[in-house]
Amino acid sequence: IELSQKESKSTFVLGTDGKNWDKIVTPFGGIRLQPDEQDLKLEIKDGNNNLWTCHQPMMKGEDVFNFSVNVAPNIINEVIKISGIDKSDIEFFAIHQANKQIVETIAEKAEIPAEKTSSETFTKYANNSTNSVVTVICDQLKNKKVKNILLCTFGIGLSWAACTIDFSDVYNGGIDTYISNQKNINKKEQIDHWIKYFKGEE
């Protein structure tokens, strides 16, 4: 990273929809709903015989899909309009890799040329949550010189954001795989570690 006096313009659009907070949520945990011993034994089956326990997240898939493919194209077009950049001058659109179908539907609805975006990163790395847009950039733009790129993300909250950024002075070396030489520890060893850690013994 080098300090520069050069101005690099960025434009952001952000939004939230708190009334639909329960579409992607872990109901128990934190301060809102602290589970006790009885809650931890709770097991519920839905109409398809899927098992849910209180410490697991839940998602209303159809609602989240519809939210994603409707809000994302709108904010993509909105941030382009505010930025003053011509859409044809945006060289790459990095879209949150929720899944392949969502990414491709957003691209189609936002009329993004296929060569200017990708769902390939999802195929390689899956949905890695808050890292996914950065992963797309590192994966798809490795060692490439581009100026105008657009980032778009959406998800829990429900929330969404998009921005245009000047990428012309950014070095992108891609993704390196780091393999740790640390030995894998089993569940009991992990629990023992955290007990000792909490007690200040480690």
Question: What kind of feature is each model-predicted range?
Answer:
Residues 69-80, 91-202:
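Claisen-condensing/thiolase-fold acyl-transfer catalytic domains that form or cleave C-C bonds
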Residues 84-89:
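Short, surface-exposed connector motifs at secondary-structure boundaries
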Residues 64, 79-83:
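Short helix-to-loop capping/linker segments positioned immediately adjacent to catalytic or ligand/cofactor-binding
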Residues 1-66, 70, 74, 166-202:
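Condensing-enzyme catalytic core mediating Claisen C-C bond formation in acyl metabolism
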